[in-house]
From Swiss-Prot:
Single GO MF descriptor: magnesium ion binding
GO CC list: cytoplasm
Organism: Yersinia enterocolitica serotype O:8 / biotype 1B (strain NCTC 13174 / 8081)
Pfam families: Pribosyltran (PF00156)
PROSITE patterns reported for this sequence: PUR_PYR_PR_TRANSFER (PS00103)
Keyword list, A-Z: Glycosyltransferase, Magnesium, Pyrimidine biosynthesis, Transferase
Annotated binding of 5-phospho-alpha-D-ribose 1-diphosphate, by residue: 26, 72-73, 99-100, 103, 105, 124-132
Protein name, UniProt field: Orotate phosphoribosyltransferase
Biological process (GO), any one: pyrimidine ribonucleoside biosynthetic process
Function in brief: Catalyzes the transfer of a ribosyl phosphate group from 5-phosphoribose 1-diphosphate to orotate, leading to the formation of orotidine monophosphate (OMP).
Length: 213
């Protein structure tokens, strides 16, 4: 685990974005942890979040020309990541996002920001069912752009209804790499370093054995 990944886990814990306990997911599964990136909701937190996304993007080795943030959660993530790439990595890249409803006046259409073209890096918080990715792919294809990769904050490394995860389905269906700042494996590695969190470690490991990929 790299330094920025450990820092991200600590950041998420401090802001209650990552919590341990018992949580019922939409799937009905009882999870020993919960991750809600929507709780990064101040200017300082958003700026810091962008730096973590930028660090992971620079680390991943995937070439891309533009950041795309799907509405709604992807919009602030794309914005703060673009700022962080420019300020901290000297990469001044365009970004773009979609509206849920197309406007018929002013800045018309469903896209806002830079023209959607070239190799697109889609940024979002998490992938649960892959629905947002499929919707985004329709937009990207309609503009003649190509999907270079998908960047998220956490990969739960968890099976969907079948034998593979929603992330693995996205990688298979769209022939792209899904990059995460951290994975569940990283969270487990972090817990292993903290003797006071042994109970949580056991619960997360058990969950991984049941539902992991």
């Amino acid at each position: 685990m790299k330094a920025y990944q450990r820092e991200f886990i600590e950041f998420a814990l401090n802001k209650q974005v990552l919590k341990f306990g018992e949580f019922t997911l939409k799937s009905g599964r009882i999870s020993p942890y919960f991750f809600n990136a929507g709780l990064f909701n101040t200017g300082l937190e958003l700026a810091k979040l962008g730096r973590f996304y930028a660090a992971a993007l620079m680390d991943c080795g995937v070439e891309f020309d533009l950041l795309f943030g799907p509405a709604y959660k992807g919009i602030p993530i794309a914005t703060t990541t673009a700022v962080a790439l420019a300020e901290h990595h000297n990469r001044d890249l365009p970004y773009c996002f979609n509206r849920k409803e197309a406007k018929d006046h002013g800045e018309g259409g469903s896209l806002v920001g830079s023209p959607l073209e070239g190799r697109v890096m889609l940024v979002d918080d998490v992938i649960t069912a892959g629905t947002a990715i499929r919707e985004s792919m329709e937009i990207i294809n309609a503009q003649g752009a190509t999907l270079a990769g998908v960047m998220i904050s956490l990969d739960r490394q968890e099976r969907g209804r079948g034998e593979i995860s929603a992330i693995q389905e996205v990688e298979r269906d769209y022939h792209c790499k899904v990059i995460a700042i951290v994975t569940l494996n990283d969270v487990i590695s972090y817990l292993e370093e903290k003797p006071e969190m042994a109970d949580h470690l056991a619960a997360v490991r058990h969950y991984r054995e049941q539902y992991g990929v």
